[in-house]
Amino acid sequence: DTDDPQWRAIYEKRCKDEGFTAYFDYSWQWAYQEKFKEAGLTAILGSGFDPGVTSVYSAYALKHYFDEIHTIDILDCNGGDHGYPFATNFNPEINLREVSANGSYWTDGHWVETKPMEWRAQYNFDQVGEKDMYLLHHEEIESLAKNIPGIKRIRFFMTFGQSYLTHMKCLEDVGMLRTCLLYTSDAAD
């Protein structure tokens, strides 16, 4: 449970002690929201592609093409394996945490949580063909739920190949995707 303060403190300390930067928490970015508003500036959460560009596209579409937007489905697809049996397209630790965490989506004014990888759908992408995609929680849906008036549903899906899923399952089976403390025996001095 990443909201558990004790767990978060232990995890943050471990990351800082080891020099890791994979710990992600956008609360420090959200804290600037009012300051940016007061200054008349636009800020984009995360500022990558998703989140980032997807939020800009959504806001642009609302401003220039639609009176209202009721549904946003973000489909994050890439077929890249970089020639390896297991590869991620960004920081592996963050990627594996996103995929192994509970999913969620916004519908009719509230959040619905799903089990990790519970929702699978297929979609035929013009350039790369039909892919399996899975509903995940992703931070831009939080910002879109707040900033797109009248939105009824927002979901985020990401595609994964079978080799990626097989390797992820192996990591999960040996406990490497756990986010809770694991004790194997009583501590002794």
Give each language-model segment a name:
Residues K63-S185:
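C-terminal catalytic/substrate-binding lobe primarily of soluble NAD(P)-dependent oxidoreductases
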Residues T2-F90:
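Glycine-/Pro-rich loop/turn segments that contact NAD(P) or position catalytic residues
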